[in-house]
Amino acid sequence: MPSRASTRALQICQANQVRLHLGLRAIASLPLGLFITFFQAHGPDVGLIMLAAFSGAMALGNLAFLLAKQQTMAEATSTLAYLPVLLLSLFALFQPEEAFFALFITGVALLGVLTAAFEGYRAKAVGLSTRDGRDLLISALIALALGLMFLIATLDSVSAVGFFGAYLILFGVHWGIASATPGSK
């Protein structure tokens, strides 16, 4: 039977791993969102490149944490949300330019819906009464709002890429705050 001190040390170690993971997610999304915000062109080609970069960074980051045994397979389920989006956005870059916008809209809608599903699943698994569960639920709801907006609203190219950039910044700030917040009480 582990002592109370060793159990507490394990909890602190796990909390630090979660914070590191969230911090790396923030580092991946904030620069991409800022790039979109301050870059003059807001065409679907820029959106697709940023979508590929974001989904690739998220998928590789989750995979790296999984391989380094810093998270379990259940915690790495969000990788499943990013891989199809990465493949779609990379596939889209090799299509005629006329198809970029439709594929960008599809990719972002897919990202939003899949991320919402997997983050929501993880939030429920972790427990909504925990800080990590609430952070995951917030991520799921923001992603769901993005996915539904891209599915329902009629957006032009500039608005669509701008909303995606805003999503990246919002997620980056949320994950940054979550990673810098002291452990659960």
Indicate where each model-derived feature is located.
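N-terminal topogenic module of multi-pass integral membrane proteins
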Residues: 1-73, 180-185
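Membrane-water interface at the C-terminal end of transmembrane alpha helices
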Residues: 11, 118-130, 150-154, 171-185
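Small-residue-rich segments of transmembrane alpha-helices in multi-pass membrane proteins
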Residues: 29-32, 80-90, 135-149
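Structural signal for membrane-spanning alpha-helices in multi-pass inner-membrane proteins
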Residues: 33-36, 62-65, 89-93, 119, ...
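Membrane-proximal helix-loop-helix units in multi-pass membrane proteins
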Residues: 86-139
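Hydrophobic alpha-helical transmembrane segments in multi-pass integral membrane proteins
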Residues: 88-98, 143-160
